[in-house]
């Protein structure tokens, strides 16, 4: 732009605000100053060498993009890109008069004269006429606005010289405009005199021709009324905001919209009885407080339908006389779809049980249609006429059904979370498992298969080790018998016994606890002494079985589980030779 320093900054800020205001955009002075400082940082050449033209401005945009790639997008002011884009559009539109004012600081009077020649030379289609005073008034107004916009804030004494210099430059612009206008006026006056000097014969012209001549003469006689064809500001309409499709109504508004679509505008509100009996009392309808419904919905969402506070809110709602339709609408509006299905199912079951119990016990019969709101009591207007006793039964069933809704997550993990504790006996675990399964499904083959599968999967690690050998062949009774005395010591002892007999652990457990044979092997019980089947240890007649096992390692060789008298090793565990083993006869001689 040919100007640097504080003067260049003020001029750039004023021109920037002027250009953007013509497009209906308002930029704060602080944002404009921040953009100018960033512009100097990115393109140091711009204040001295650049100008407000499309080529230089595109170069600035490329350097801004390069700066963002090197330093990151966070280093660029948030208003930099929008301002650059708006100025690029203005420069593309070639707004000559505004750009001439922006470049006025570095243009001489002769250059201004050349630049204004194109604006002052008008064709016959572009000429506009009026009073000369009006023309100058419009020019003065535009120039004064520019001066006031630039010098609308007080400055220090050291900046007064810059201010006077800029005002002188504005006066130069006005002087060039006036000179071009005077030259144009003289040329028009010469043409007008030549036109008037022409000898016209009045008799040779028709009235239509006279009208045309008068119109043309009026144009030429109005030289004093020539105005400068100043380009008016083009005020662009702001784009209309995008109209988003409104969201569907929810809650009571959604119910109202659905009722309007179906044509059912009959409202059912809580019934209020003012008297003591149905004979001397007329029901009065009042709306359920919206605050109560919001409180109930909030409690269900935040704490769950089975929380104590939620149940208190339900009891508060139940203190009024609600019809079946009221309860269904309240449950549907506050509960989740899954919980609403559970509530409705439980409500129907409670209503059926109440009808069966009330059969023959009341003078006025209570039908299932009254409690469910079906049949002849389907419409809300018919439910309003129900007696107090029926409405009381409806409320009781609705509250009981609400309390039957399980807590969140319990219904999904009730069986998966039923596991045997580390210190819990296996028979107690089986009892809890059967109770939970039979609550969910009736007794039968399917429930037995599920219990057997969970009895293995949800057992603790100790019982699983005991059950594993007979998992596929045993029954629930075999599982219980195998885990009857389950403890770590029992498992370790069984492992030692299997190792001493040279059997696998699984084979030993099968022989001991059976595989679906009532706790015995295929050939009867197994003797722990001789390892044979058909008898137990106390009935074993084998002499070898009566010999007592050694308590530990051999004291002679230290590397075998046998008695010292039976040791046949010639070397001990360290490889040292051992003396010959003394017999009982040699020991007696030494004595």
From Swiss-Prot:
The record marks 99-100, 195-196, 228-229, 254-255, 269-270, 496-497 as: Cleavage. PROSITE patterns: ZF_CCHC. A motif (PTAP/PSAP motif) lies at residues 305-308. The keyword rRNA processing does not apply. The keyword S-adenosyl-L-methionine does not apply. InterPro entries: B_retro_matrix (IPR003322), B_retro_matrix_sf (IPR038124), Gag_p24_C (IPR045345), Primate_lentivir_Gag_pol-like (IPR050195), Retrov_capsid_C (IPR008916), Retrov_capsid_N (IPR008919), Retrovr_matrix (IPR010999), Znf_CCHC (IPR001878). One of its GO terms (biological process) is viral translational frameshifting. A zinc finger (CCHC-type) spans 525-542, 552-569. Transmembrane segments: none annotated. Residues 151-169, 178-191 have a biased composition (Basic and acidic residues). GO terms for cellular component: viral nucleocapsid. Keywords: Capsid protein, DNA-binding, Host-virus interaction, Lipoprotein, Metal-binding, Myristate, Nucleotide-binding, Phosphoprotein, Repeat, Viral budding, Viral budding via the host ESCRT complexes, Viral matrix protein, Viral nucleoprotein, Viral release from host cell, Virion, Zinc, Zinc-finger. Residues 151-191, 568-591 are annotated as: Disordered. A lipid is attached at residue 2 (N-myristoyl glycine). Coiled coil: none annotated. GO terms for molecular function: DNA binding; nucleotide binding; structural constituent of virion; zinc ion binding. SMART domains: ZnF_C2HC. This is Gag polyprotein. It comes from Mouse mammary tumor virus (strain BR6) (MMTV). The gene is gag.
